[in-house]
Every structure is written in C-alpha cells, then in structure tokens.
Amino acid sequence: MIEGVVVTPLSVIETKGGDVLHGLKQSEQGYAGFGEAYFSMIEYGVIKGWKQHKKMVLNLVVPIGMVRFVLYDERKDSRSYEQFQEITLSRSMNYCRLTVPPMVWFGFQGYDKLANMLLNIANIEHSQDELNH
C-alpha cells in the first residue's frame, strides 16, 4: 500500500425508488477541505494517465461502471518510494472511496462496456499549474 493512500468502504443505502450512495463526510479520514467536485466519464478500455497533482488531495468514487486505478509513488521521502498499487472500484463489487495524496502518480481505465464514471471530491480547485502529465 502506498503511504498516504486510503481506501474507505462506503455505504449503499437501498431505498424504494432508488439507492443512496455515500461519498464523503467531513468527519471522515480523507477529508482535507473542499475545493471542487467533478465527474469524469471514462470510455470502455480507455486509459487516462499518468497524472500527478502537486497540491490536490483526490477523493475518488466510482458510482457507475467499473474503474481500475494504478498508482505509483516517486516521493523519495516516502516509505513506499517506487512502489505501485492497483485497485478496482465499482458500485457492485468494491464500493469504496480512494484517497490519493499530492505527488502520487496515477492512471485509470474504464472496465464497463456501458458507462464508467468517477467522482473526484478535491480539496482545492483544479489548476493546470499544479498538475503534471
């Protein structure tokens, strides 16, 4: 496991007329403030990455489809320096929130043929200045 990366199981509350899917509470580990939330659609088989945020803490949730994430730690002062971590998230199999700290490289791939959506609840607003590709 990469130092600072947290995988938090989330609740799905079944209700008549449609389920409620938890995302992030202010009281939970991983919450580092609120800057913005955005959704990203990933087509089946498409890989998006590599990306690295210099300041942003990402809280990634997959409410629709299935997304595989690969992370890499190049932080020289980290206990997990040069390690990889993989995790696949989906509502049906592994409904969790993936918290990714700044300076960890990551990429992701859509695994569902119909639709794949991830939600990022970020602690700061997105800026190209703090993003490496």
Cite the ranges covered by each PLM segment.
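Non-catalytic, conserved peripheral segments adjacent to functional cores
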Residues: 1-94, 111-133
